[in-house]
């Protein structure tokens, strides 16, 4: 419906899918009870964009189409995965089986840090406008796998404090908080000498990063100084925490401050039904913000 233009499907409307297409592929429980597999073309219009001539859904993604020559379009990929989780895992890590580092972790591991006060790899989970059939997103998708844990993604929350416990408890000043962290880290170093678990060093670095983020995160997340034309560019939804537009704006601010890799998840694209009712809302969430970025 968005990127895979197949005009011939209009001529094949309601005809059965040829057996050569399925090629013996096993069925899922969602389709195993179907008596037939009729072909249904997209109901949207497609147009070619840019010098590359990429075909895109021009009804729902007109702004994204303006950047067709700036985007890497990969249309040669294939997978044997027939369900969401292994497919998502393969897209994030290159393998359907969990436990391998994701792309952001590799970027952190290979490139290092440009800002000691923010993580190398940040994850933002945007809330879709239409939340019908919304599915959970697991933190294992931004796991560092067999790489040191310090390279795992750090998820910023869309409500409350961006990072849990980033603020001092009531009545605890900064110097006391620093003394507490230093004491805990000293105990962790003693534990490492006894046990030798390398993840102990990860824990030490996490405590130290959390303390430094107390100063950097409030400035990062304060959008009050963003000029009005920025909100016109990204859309009014950019003012709403947790929206895709807000996440894209936050991603820009993170990258400007030296964060190596920012990944935004925008859920609820699993349209089993009412595609024409849900797809426009999803595309409206992402089209203008992606154009602005």
Which stretches of residues belong to each language-model region?
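Ligand-binding pockets and gating/stacking loops
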Residues: 1-293
